[in-house]
Swiss-Prot record:
The gene is rpsG. This is Small ribosomal subunit protein uS7. Belongs to the universal ribosomal protein uS7 family. CDD domains: uS7_Bacteria. Gene3D superfamilies: Ribosomal protein S7 domain (1.10.455.10).
Length: 156
């Protein structure tokens, strides 16, 4: 454990094309092996496809998708007297954004479309319409928290 406390959060620069921090975070989640320009090409291509299919601002579509994917509750393991309980806890706002982006990207990778641009675009569109694997993951997470509500008094 570090003695100086938690590392400070570095400021996030706005995206040069859309002027949105959310797009920057999405680019960083898509990023593999330090290939930032490739990640940007994938994200911008996906957002452009989303614009063509919906006819609306892609950042608005992305935000709507994020609102549908962001979890408000999750379960954390807590050991009490030799038993491990799944304790439901509220998710911090920054963690909910991180989880939503992680789920969007990971479930787009698992899709069947040909290119990553198409996969990401379709996952964002599905999520903005309340469909898709990322939204299902959020619902499963909430269901799990609801099922373990009896252990909520073990929160820390």
């Amino acid at each position: 454990m570090p003695r100086k406390g938690p590392a400070p959060k570095r400021p996030l620069v706005n995206d040069p094309v859309y002027g949105s921090q959310l797009v920057t975070q999405l680019v960083n989640k898509v990023l593999l092996d330090g290939k930032k320009s490739l990640a940007e090409r994938i994200v911008y291509g996906a957002l452009e496809q989303a614009r063509e299919k919906t006819g609306t601002d892609p950042v608005v579509t992305l935000k709507r998708a994020m609102d549908n994917v962001k979890p408000s509750l999750e379960v954390r393991s807590r050991r009490v007297g030799g038993a491990t309980y799944q304790v439901p806890v509220e998710v911090r706002p920054d963690r909910s954004v991180t989880l939503a982006l992680r789920w969007l990207v990971s479930f787009s990778k698992a899709r069947r479309e040909k290119t990553m641009v198409e996969r990401l675009a379709n996952e964002i569109l599905d999520a903005s319409n309340g469909l898709g694997a990322a939204v299902k993951r959020r619902e499963d997470t909430h269901k799990m928290a609801e099922a373990n509500r009896a252990f909520a008094h073990y929160r820390w």
